[in-house]
């Protein structure tokens, strides 16, 4: 009998059953759909209602000011606001995919509202054409809209996220003065087009055009397979005739047309074949048309809702009140003044169980449970009959339970599945548990207080993540949290949204008390971003609360920037240095640098070693003057001196400061300033003396360049200066440098010997060697000659070397093996020198002969 009562509610359309269960008795009062513009969101979303200003209606006790009211699907008021926007009449209103209410008025201005009836700034516009010509019609899809102006222009916004209006190409006949012929619009959504961009279908009279972003095409349809003589054919050859209304199927593959002669024509958009051609009793265009899933089309006239299928007679539903058709992916919700129904095709699993006279395995299993509850042996008989198909029967019961809105029927079907599962060893046990979890979630959100009547197919398409997002946007945080916990999903999004909403809703709650409330919930989720909540608190003007919240943020990368934004520079510097992240420290340093006076800034970083060192490292490269101020403020005079000294070197490297230029004067002054600063500290006596010597040398070099007119002296060393003077023949200047800087005789001999060898002035070198006995002997002369590759000149000085080892090595270097061997034999080093020479002169037997006595001794 239960099967009979369930199936009795069904309607048969050809070979497919449809059902129309009541979902809600509407909770609202004094709402007449015929007097209002209504926008219903898909997936069981909210309903927006506003009095239709294009109709003359009796106000009764209502205010003359219109109110925009937002209800849930059960008719419970969520929010309302007074509509007082300029721009003319409200032309169109629809919900976007993210549940933003889009309202377009006559002059093309777009007003956006959230679910709480709060206006989202800024207001947008459909463009200048809409403003000048006025909007007469709007067609919305999930994330876009196309508007028709009085001048026949099509203006489209393809994505509400960008809000960029685009003018579509002109449609033939649409911009003509005679617009008395029927015009209708519909949209094929981007996800169903080849280009990935929405296509606007425009019917002008008996022509249908596909309008894309940059082109317009005319559609021609092929003849159907039925008797051609019954088809209407106008003079232009169009088989369909004048179109008065049209809609696109949910999958974008079919186009439904209602013609001037009362025919419903369904066309395949890909093949251009007419799939259905049905003549209605009335030629009046329906007020509404909608697809019911993919199997039938609904047409609504006053008091009559007709459902047409591919074959067979239509099904009629009669209403004594106005209704709104709300298409869904698996059916149509029917909203009236008093209730909300859901018209859908009966799922195959449900049909197999409850169809009158059904003997399917699932029906027998459901019947077996009934016998089992009545302690009848018939239960065992039914199980034996379906033993081979028991898994299939269990699966059908589970699937049917998922499609039910009635909780009692859900339980009965799941009990039948569990009963059959006990006798089915190879069935996946998790399947029942998964369906139970899904149904618990669906039943929770279907509660009238929540008012989201999702079917299981809609729930899977929407996904739990989006459902939770919609719950928290509706401030149903507790339910969202419980669902997140139940489905093992991340709770952070829910708790964070609740915390932000709590701060917004508690302007008079003391910061300390509100902090306790927030922490009590925020601590439920590990790793939650306290910084994000603190940012919201700061945006709400609760800076103290923001500072208290950010103290609990464990991630320095989020904590420090927020501390800076709320003016807590001291705390930010502490947290940044404690983290050891140099990027964060630099962020704080630059922020404070810009915000605070220099002395205050210096005092802040002086006590923080890492911050101070990083600042000094940066300033050394880019901000010398500022760094000098810092060192002076901290008493580090010697550091200022080093900076001055470095500046003098940098000035010398300046390509604009050519040698011998007047810039050497400023350089010397900088060095002298550095010397004066060094002299003020006992620890830097050496640096003071070095700076003094540097300045003195720079002056002499500048004078030399001026006298020789050769820019080759400045920035060279004392040795190089002396050597250059000798090379140039300026012996007097070389002696002056030697005397001025107290160059030792030993170094003088080395420098002069090599300088004379460089210019190959061998006579002068020989004369120099004979002036007086060299303090280091004749080795500098030997080295200079060998270095100049002058063996003959070297032989003048090698015999004068007193050290046998040095003499032998000198002979060896110029290739005189015998003389080198003689010196090595006379040297008192145990044959070590001979051994070295033997390795140097591989083919020379002299060293082997001389080494024999030493080898015998060893």
From Swiss-Prot:
Could you tell me the keywords of this UniProt record?
A: Membrane, Vacuole
Q: What name does this protein carry?
A: Protein VACUOLELESS1
One Pfam family hit: Vps16_C
Give the function comment from the record.
Required for vacuole biogenesis and vacuole enlargment in dividing and expanding cells. Involved in the docking or fusion of prevacuolar vesicles. Important for the function of both male and female gametophytes, but is not essential for the germination and development of pollen.
Keyword Cytoplasm included in the entry's annotation: no
What coarse category fits the chief subcellular location reported for this protein?
membrane
What is the tissue specificity? Expressed in roots, leaves, stems, siliques, flowers and mature pollen.
Against PANTHER family, the record matches this protein to: VACUOLAR PROTEIN SORTING VPS16, VACUOLAR PROTEIN SORTING-ASSOCIATED PROTEIN 16 HOMOLOG
Q: Name one GO biological process term.
A: intracellular protein transport
- Mind telling me which InterPro entries this protein's record contains? VPS16, Vps16_C, Vps16_C_sf, Vps16_N, WD40_repeat_dom_sf
Give the membrane topology, semicolon-separated if more than one: Peripheral membrane protein
């Amino acid at each position: 009998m239960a099967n009979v009562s369930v199936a009795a509610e069904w309607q048969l359309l050809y070979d497919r059953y449809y059902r129309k269960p009541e979902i809600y008795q509407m909770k609202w009062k004094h709402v007449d759909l015929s007097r209002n513009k209504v926008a219903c969101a898909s997936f069981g979303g909210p309903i927006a209602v506003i009095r239709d200003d294009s109709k003359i209606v009796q106000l009764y006790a209502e205010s003359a000011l219109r109110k925009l009211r937002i209800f849930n699907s059960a008719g419970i008021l969520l929010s309302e606001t007074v509509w007082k926007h300029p721009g003319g009449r409200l032309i169109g209103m629809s919900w976007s995919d993210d549940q933003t209410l889009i309202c377009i008025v006559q002059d093309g201005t777009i007003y956006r509202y959230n679910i709480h009836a709060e206006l989202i700034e800024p207001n947008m516009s459909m463009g200048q054409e809409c403003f000048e010509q006025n909007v007469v019609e709007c067609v919305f899809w999930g994330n876009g809209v196309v508007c028709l102006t009085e001048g026949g222009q099509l203006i489209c916004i393809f994505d509400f996220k960008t809000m960029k209006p685009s003018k579509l190409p002109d449609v033939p006949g649409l911009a003509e003065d005679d617009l008395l012929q029927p015009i209708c619009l519909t949209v094929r959504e981007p996800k169903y087009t080849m280009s990935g961009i929405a296509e606007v279908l425009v019917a002008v009279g008996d022509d249908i055009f596909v309008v894309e972003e940059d082109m317009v095409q005319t559609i021609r349809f092929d003849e159907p397979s039925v008797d051609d003589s019954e088809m209407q054919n106008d003079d232009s050859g169009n088989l369909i005739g004048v179109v008065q209304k049209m809609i696109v199927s949910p999958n974008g593959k079919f186009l439904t047309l209602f013609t001037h002669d009362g025919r419903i024509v369904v066309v395949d958009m890909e093949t251009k074949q007419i799939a259905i051609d049905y003549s209605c009793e009335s030629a009046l265009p329906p007020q509404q048309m909608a697809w019911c899933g993919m199997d039938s089309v609904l047409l609504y006239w006053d008091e009559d809702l007709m459902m047409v299928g591919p074959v067979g007679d239509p099904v009629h539903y009669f209403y004594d009140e106005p209704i709104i058709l709300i298409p869904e992916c698996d059916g149509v919700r029917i909203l009236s003044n008093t209730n909300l129904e859901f018209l859908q095709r009966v799922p195959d699993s449900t049909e197999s169980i409850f169809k009158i006279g059904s003997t399917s395995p699932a029906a027998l299993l459901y019947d077996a449970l009934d016998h089992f509850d009545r302690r009848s042996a018939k239960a065992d008989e039914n199980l034996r009959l379906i033993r081979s198909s028991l898994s299939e029967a269990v699966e059908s019961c589970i699937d049917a339970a998922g499609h039910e809105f009635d909780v009692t029927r859900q339980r009965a079907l799941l009990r039948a599945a569990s009963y059959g599962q006990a006798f089915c060893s190879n069935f996946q046990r998790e399947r029942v548990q998964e369906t139970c979890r899904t149904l618990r979630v669906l039943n929770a959100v279907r509660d009238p207080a929540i008012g989201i009547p999702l079917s299981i197919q809609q729930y899977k398409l929407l996904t739990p993540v989006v459902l939770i997002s919609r719950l928290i946007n509706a401030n149903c945080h507790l339910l969202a949290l419980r669902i997140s916990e139940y489905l093992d999903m991340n709770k952070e999004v829910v708790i964070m949204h609740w915390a932000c909403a709590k701060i917004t809703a508690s302007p008079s709650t003391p910061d300390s008390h509100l902090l306790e409330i927030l922490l009590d919930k925020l601590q439920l989720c590990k790793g939650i971003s306290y910084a994000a909540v603190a940012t919201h608190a700061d945006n709400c003007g609760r800076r103290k609360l923001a500072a208290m919240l950010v103290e609990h943020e464990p991630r320095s990368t989020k904590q420090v920037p927020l501390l800076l934004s709320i003016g807590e520079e001291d705390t930010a510097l502490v947290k940044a240095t404690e983290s050891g992240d140099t990027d964060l420290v630099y962020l704080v340093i630059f922020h404070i640098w810009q915000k605070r006076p220099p002395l205050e800034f210096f005092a802040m970083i002086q006590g923080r070693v890492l911050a101070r060192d990083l600042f000094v490292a940066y300033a050394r490269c880019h901000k010398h003057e500022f760094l000098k101020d810092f060192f002076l403020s901290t008493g580090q005079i010697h550091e200022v001196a080093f900076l001055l000294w470095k500046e003098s070197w940098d000035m010398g490297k300046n390509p604009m400061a050519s040698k011998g230029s007047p810039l050497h004067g400023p350089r010397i002054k900088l060095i002298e300033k550095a010397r004066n600063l060094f002299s003020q500290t006992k620890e830097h006596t050496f640096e003071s003396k070095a700076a003094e010597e540097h300045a003195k040398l720079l002056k002499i070099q500048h004078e030399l360049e001026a006298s020789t007119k050769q820019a080759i002296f400045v920035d060279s060393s004392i040795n190089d200066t002396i050597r250059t003077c000798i090379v140039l023949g300026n012996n007097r200047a070389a002696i002056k440098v030697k005397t001025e800087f107290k160059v030792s005789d030993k170094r003088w001999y080395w420098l002069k010997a090599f300088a004379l060898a460089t210019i190959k002035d061998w006579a002068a070198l020989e004369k120099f060697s004979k002036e007086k006995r060299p303090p280091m002997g004749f080795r500098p002369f030997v080295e200079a000659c060998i270095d100049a590759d002058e063996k003959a000149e070297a032989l003048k000085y090698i015999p004068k070397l007193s050290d046998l080892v040095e003499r032998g090595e000198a002979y060896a270097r110029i290739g005189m093996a015998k003389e080198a061997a003689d010196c090595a034999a006379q040297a008192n080093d145990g044959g070590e020198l001979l051994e070295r020479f033997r390795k140097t002169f591989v083919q020379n037997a002299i060293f082997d002969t001389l080494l024999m006595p030493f080898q015998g001794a060893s």
